[in-house]
Every structure is written in C-alpha cells, then in structure tokens.
Regions:
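Cysteine-centered motifs
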Residues: 3-5, 20
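Bacterial N-terminal signal peptides that target proteins for export
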Residues: 10-29
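Bacterial N-terminal signal peptides
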Residues: 26-38
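Glycan-processing catalytic domains of CAZymes
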Residues: 42-361, 367-396
Length: 398
C-alpha cells in the first residue's frame, strides 16, 4: 500500500496491492519505488532505496551492523522490540504473521498479529510461507492464508518464497510480492539461478514485484539437505556478483541474501564471504538507479566467438544481455540507455552484440576506465568467468 504519509498527502487510501500499483503507474512511479514506498513506511524505505535484504539476522543487536553494510530489509519476528530497533536503523522487516500457510494455519493468531503490528512503520511485508512448492502446500491453502491476512485489515503486502521458478504458474500471483530462492553453489551450475529467476518473472504478473533470494552461505553447514554431495563451499566473490546482476538482468525488482547467521553467527564463520557480500551490496547501492531501471525491448543480435560455448548449462545464452533505461540518473549513471551483460558461466567468452541503434560516438564501459570496441553498430568485448559489464550511457544514434 502507499505509505501513510504519501496517502494522506494525496488524499488517497488503498487496501489492495494491485490498486497501489495502478495508482503508482499513474503517478509515474516504478515498481521498485512502489515496493519501497508501499511496504514499510516513508521513513524506513524512502523512494530512492532499492530493496536489498538479508535472512536470519538473529538478535536486534545485529541490525546496526546490517544497516551499515547497506541492507534495508531483514527477515525477523513481528515483535515490538525488534520492529522498533529495525525502525531506528532504517530497516524494514519481512515477518511471519504468526502462523504459516498450510494444514496447521492458525487464523486467530494471524488476525491478532496483524492487528497488533501491521501499522508499525518497520513492518515491510507479511511472510505467508517459505517454499510451499517444496513442502507440498497447495496453492489453495496459501491463498487462504493470504485472504485471512487481508481480511484482518493488513495494509502491508504479503510475500511468499518459491523454490522452483516453474511453480510460479501456480503460486506466483497469490501474494503481493513473489520471491524465489536458488542456492546452486557448487552442486548446480550457476546458470540455474538465472534460469529460475527468469521463469518466475515470466509466470508472474508484470506489475507484481519479484524478489530474488541469493546464496551467501556454504552448503557444508547444511550437508544433510544434500546427501552425497561433496566438495561443498560458499560462493566466490565473482559468483556472488554474477548472481546479483543476473537477478537484475532477469527482471527481479529486489534482492535478498541467505544468510547473515551462516556468515556471522554460527560456530564456523565466514568473514571473507561477509566482506565480499558487503562489497557487492555497496556496489548495488552506488548503482541503485541502474537496478531500478526500466527494461526495454530491443531487436537484439549477438554472437559468441567460440560457438561451442555459446550456451550455458541451462541451455540459454552464456552471456545474458539486456537493455535498460535509466530515467532519473545521478552523478555516476546519467539518464539514458545502458546495456547490462552478465557471464553466467565459469568460462571466458569473446562476446559481440549489436547496439539498439547506430551509435554516433564512443560507448563507455561503466567504472572500468575504458570504452568498448565498436564500429558504431556492434560492440565486441572479452568476458572473464562470471564477469559483469555495463555499457553506457549509449550515445545518440546517427
């Protein structure tokens, strides 16, 4: 919903997320801005902030560390002390309404929780259920939980998290926000992450936010979930960055990482992984206008020098490229069009793509101190394993 201060300013009230989205479109707000504005209150998530969250934060004493790292969302309890601490640190909370969707769903407890905490400015969204597709909780039971939350008077949106992007055809349009988690490192190809974000986006209404949940843990700590898998490890800094930009390339409107506890609170800690994640989140914050940019269709043509490696393990293009339009730029990214290209593989590639129009000047590569090699129509560049390049702003056409 629109946050209270904006709703009062406009003299508007909305009880449905879709109504909020339609209103926001009329006002010229992006889906990401709506996700920020409509969920946690103006103070907690101002319009400019792109949603970046993290799971399993433990006590509220850790929230300052999390806020300092650039996160503005966490999962946590619907408890006054925790919500107050989150608000003080400028963080929104994805919280359970007191009972998860399923056979044991406690509607009375949910109504009481919503009545007590829904208006708290730090309450970002009500977490209906985690991975109903994996746990075989039917879409009908999830819908029932969503309806109970809404009938209880919730103004904050509902959320659910899927395990498989293909299941979004059944679950993707139940909650106000659809999330999907894929943790492929190292037992699946990294391309599996990108593939399932894409499936979720395609099966979910275009005006419904999709949030990607990214692996930031070592499966060694959860080896019982992957019996027989060997050589488990956490993601590298390059894999973390590639998955983060893959989420943007495949249409996600926000990102979460799993989890703070795995890196910082358990007996075996991962300080290098935490530092790598902080660098990625800092980069997202510096490039917020890119992450909030509009995806634009273009008559794309591309080519791989080595045809034998042009497909990744998901049988999609090894390098995923999209055209983005930044409407409201900043000092780093002026308004204009940019091409984001993400190598989803552990292999190097020489990759060529045709520009949307014949360029009348050089094509800068964002924050790399160089210009792309181009003849005005095509760009050719070298991609290291899991590399990310951003080209733009694209010069005007001739």
């Amino acid at each position: 919903m629109l946050c209270g201060c904006l709703a009062r300013r406009l003299g508007l009230e909305s009880r449905a997320m879709n109504g909020c989205l339609r209103l926001g479109q009329a006002l010229g707000l992006s889906a990401v801005a709506l996700l920020a504005l409509g969920s946690a209150g103006c103070r907690v998530l101002p319009e400019a902030d792109y949603p970046v969250g993290i799971y399993s934060v433990g006590s509220e004493t850790n929230l300052a560390d999390i806020a300092d790292a650039g996160f503005n969302l966490v999962t946590g309890p619907a408890r006054r002390g925790f919500l107050d601490a989150a608000e003080a640190n400028g963080i929104g909370v994805l919280a359970s309404p007191g009972s998860h969707a399923g056979e044991g769903f406690d509607a009375a407890k949910v109504r009481a929780t919503v009545a007590t905490h829904d208006r708290h400015p730090a309450l970002w969204s009500w977490y209906l259920i985690d991975e109903p597709d994996m746990h075989r909780v039917s879409p009908e039971l999830v819908t029932e939980a969503h309806q109970v939350v809404k009938r209880a008077g919730a103004r904050k949106p509902t959320s659910l998290v899927l395990f498989r992007g293909d299941e979004a055809q059944w679950y993707g349009n139940i909650a106000d926000i659809t999330m999907v988690d894929r943790y492929p490192v190292p037992w699946l190809p990294l391309a599996n992450f990108s593939q399932h974000i894409h499936k979720t986006r395609l099966a979910t209404d275009a005006n419904r936010p999709v949030v990607a949940v990214i692996q930031s843990f070592d499966w060694t700590a959860h080896q019982g979930v992957l019996p027989g898998e060997e050589n488990l490890r956490p993601p590298t800094k390059h894999e973390l960055r590639s998955m983060t930009y893959s989420a943007l390339a495949r249409g996600a409107n926000g990102i979460f990482y799993y989890s703070y506890a795995d890196m910082r609170l358990k007996e075996r800690k991962y300080p290098e992984l935490w530092e790598a994640l902080k660098r990625v989140v800092k980069e997202v914050r510096q490039r917020e206008v890119l992450f909030a940019a509009e995806h634009v269709w273009w008559p794309k043509a591309h080519h791989f020098e080595n045809q034998d490696t042009r497909f990744n393990a998901a049988l999609e293009a090894s390098v995923q490229s999209v055209l983005l339009r930044v409407k409201r730029g900043d000092g780093l990214l002026p308004p204009g069009h940019y091409i984001l290209a993400v190598n989803t593989t552990p292999l190097p590639h020489t990759y060529r793509f045709r520009l949307p129009w014949r360029a009348g000047g050089q094509v800068p590569v964002l924050e790399e101190g160089r210009h792309a090699t181009t003849d005005g129509s095509w760009v050719v560049d070298r991609f290291d394993p899991f590399a990310v390049h951003v080209y733009g702003p694209l010069p005007a056409g001739k």
